[in-house]
Curated annotation (Swiss-Prot):
Signal sequence segment: none
Encoding gene (name): yceH
The organism's place on the tree of life at top rank: Bacteria
Lineage: Bacteria, Pseudomonadati, Pseudomonadota, Gammaproteobacteria, Enterobacterales
Organism: Salmonella paratyphi A (strain AKU_12601)
Record's protein name: UPF0502 protein YceH
Family: Belongs to the UPF0502 family.
One Pfam family this sequence matches: DUF480
Gene3D superfamilies the record matches: Winged helix-like DNA-binding domain superfamily/Winged helix DNA-binding domain
Length: 215
């Protein structure tokens, strides 16, 4: 694969993919918008605290690698960014809506079980059942131009295996197992996190609307 992203680059691309679907009225994003999205406390693992300068450096690098492009509207002096990571006119990576939702959630949160992915990706794509989630993951894992995800060995005491994306290169399963957070009620936690993320999105929309009305 030609995708060798750093953790920060993966966060930036994941945020742009997420906002393109969940808040299309605010997309493309300005530098400040990307900073806010990257440092968001909901639906992010780990939580980051990136500066504007750090984000700008990542954006510049990703533009050079043709994973993003800048957009300047008529009369708009603020440079905005949109993703060309997948489904762009001249790009090679083509993903379905279900695949975009899962890839985005994996980019933003790292290794997760199919159950966690179904809950956390629900704002981007409504999966009909667990079978759809699992079949989508298997397609991503077996694509000829991939693989883009891999299933990790099931951890002791866990009911489900976790999946992780491969856009940052190969994974070290041992380090992932030792650093995996404990979760006694993963499904409930996922639902709470999804609700918190939805509230955060609604707050962003309200703030944007109030700012627009105040102009």
């Amino acid at each position: 694969m030609k995708y060798e992203l750093t953790a920060t680059e993966a966060r930036v691309i994941g945020c742009l993919l997420e906002k393109q679907v969940t808040t299309p009225e605010q997309y493309p994003l300005s530098v400040n918008g990307v900073v806010t999205a990257c440092n968001q406390k909901t639906n992010r693992e780990p939580v980051m605290n990136l500066t504007e300068q750090e984000v700008q450096e990542q954006l510049d690098n990703l533009v050079k690698r043709h994973f993003l492009r800048t957009v300047s509207g008529f009369g708009n002096r603020v440079t905005k960014y949109e993703q060309r990571f997948c489904n762009s006119e001249f790009g090679d990576l083509k993903l379905s809506a279900a695949e975009v939702a899962l890839v985005t959630t994996l980019l933003l949160r790292g290794a997760q079980t199919p159950g966690e992915l179904r809950s956390r990706a629900s704002r981007m794509h409504e999966f009909s059942d667990m079978a759809e989630v699992e079949s989508t993951l298997e397609r991503l894992a077996s694509r000829e131009d991939g693989p883009y995800v891999v299933r990790l060995a099931r951890e002791p005491g866990k009911r489900e295996s976790r999946y992780i994306h491969l856009f940052c290169g190969d994974v070290d399963e041992l380090s992932l197992q030792t650093s995996a957070p404990e979760s006694a009620s993963g499904d409930l936690q996922s639902r709470v996190e999804a609700l918190e993320s939805e509230v955060a999105e609604l707050k962003q929309r309200l703030d944007s609307l109030l700012a627009h009305l105040g102009e």
